[in-house]
Amino acid sequence: MQDQYILALDQGTTSSRAMLFDRQGNIVSIAQKEFEQIYPRPGWVEHDPQEIWSTQAGVAAEAVTRVGLNGTSIAAIGITNQRETTIVWDRETGHPIYNAIVWQDRRTADFCDQLKAQGLSEKVRAKTGLPIDSYFSATKIRWILDNVEGAREKARQGKLAFGTVDSWLVWNFTKHELHVTDVTNASRTMLFNIHTLDWDDELLDALEIPRSMLPQVRASSEIYGPTKTTVFASKIPLAGIAGDQQAALFGQMCTSSGMVKNTYGTGCFLMMNTGETPIESQNNLVTTIAWQVDGKVNYALEGSIFIAGAVVQWLRDGLGIIKSASEIEALAAGVPHTDGVYLVPAFAGLGAPHWNARARGSLFGVTRGTTSAHLARAALDSIAYQSLDVLKAMEADSGIRIGELRVDGGASANNLLMQFQADLLGVDAVRPRVTETTALGAAYLAGLAIGYWKNVDELHSQWQLERRFAPSMQREQVSSCLCGWQRAVRAAKAWADDTQ
């Protein structure tokens, strides 16, 4: 396998990407193609499943051919994907019966309220680790069965298949032979029992979803089967699958209990490895599966922040303070601090650990002396404050003091933000040399399954530091900053609650 590579397919919310990795974990080639976002009604978000497949197959071929290689140069394929997004297709024709309903879609919010009113919340959380929410796949499947003509009858006859995006890609790569998913994607459906590691019949009955629709659940690192499409002339083992955030946790080599990563994108996704025992959160975090490798399941706590990098986009597009997102660091660095200004970017409510849907964006402490630089700094600081709130909830739930924070995603390139994050947390923020950790994680999982890499220890030896940000702020100053932030969050919530 000396001259072979691992192909990672990263099927995201706005684009399909493919990356080739060599044995040292370096990116050899990369290809990307965006696809259409479909908004049929306010709060509804859909994708065309055929476009998901065509763009992903296209970039897979492009990444390989652009460096003069072919399928024989690929040792294995790993898949990572946007989670929860729901596709239902006809087993006989292989065609979707409706568009993919995306994780952001809120059309089933009222139905979720009905499930809560039936007293199902505790049962769902105990079995799946998840709150009842339209974010997850279960109610999206139910909506398709209830609203697509003939769907319920076809499902009863066993003619329909459900899958998250990974399942849909594998189904197509194997010419409709394999209907599988992995434990990480299954754990995001609200139908999978994370303790028994099987679909939960009681929840399937409650949601009136036939078990025959569901894929077989497999480990995150194993050979599922060979490709059979014309995308590649040779058959390549499909050998790794993980949801995007779990893949990033693995790509960051957070393989020990208590290790944490934060992906700074449009929002933030924080995940802590909690080892081989699931921890039920008392602080509004999600309990989920991190991965299953070598027969062992690792669990994780996860917290999502709705607005992170998006606050920078707002400064650019909404206020016109900056012309491009990259300008914010220099502007914010023009002042030593915010001078008491706090921005709570609750443009779409507050995510973990607050989960307040009514809260709205709020700005506090503004004076005549407040400048665009202060606003820019307050915007960056808000990302670090929100992340700290989730990290403190993780520490409280797990009883583990975080030793360091591994960071990735677009906004992790902002040195000012990373330094402030380290200052608030009181431990180092650590940025790796390869920040494409999601694709890297998928590559690692596939490579382990075929022996391309011997074991996790070999992968640990590859992880390389790009920069370490050590805390430098006095703790008294940190405490003062945090008091101001907590006041601002309380006020933002109070404003939302006081509608009189």
UniProtKB/Swiss-Prot annotation:
It is an enzyme of class 2 (transferase). Its EC number is 2.7.1.30. It comes from the Bacteria. InterPro entries: ATPase_NBD, Carb_kinase_FGGY, Carb_kinase_FGGY_CS, FGGY_C, FGGY_N, Glycerol_kin. Sn-glycerol 3-phosphate binds at residues 13, 83-84, 135, 244. It holds the Pfam family FGGY_C. It catalyses: glycerol + ATP = sn-glycerol 3-phosphate + ADP + H(+). The keyword Phosphoprotein does not apply. Inhibited by fructose 1,6-bisphosphate (FBP). One of its GO terms (biological process) is glycerol-3-phosphate metabolic process. GO terms for cellular component: cytosol. Glycerol binds at residues 83-84, 135, 244-245. ADP binds at residues 13, 17, 266, 309, 410, 414. Pathway: Polyol metabolism; glycerol degradation via glycerol kinase pathway; sn-glycerol 3-phosphate from glycerol: step 1/1. One of its GO terms (molecular function) is glycerol kinase activity. ATP binds at residues 13-15, 266, 309, 313, 410. Belongs to the FGGY kinase family. Key enzyme in the regulation of glycerol uptake and metabolism. Catalyzes the phosphorylation of glycerol to yield sn-glycerol 3-phosphate. NCBIfam families: glycerol_kin, PRK00047.1. This is Glycerol kinase. It comes from Burkholderia thailandensis (strain ATCC 700388 / DSM 13276 / CCUG 48851 / CIP 106301 / E264).
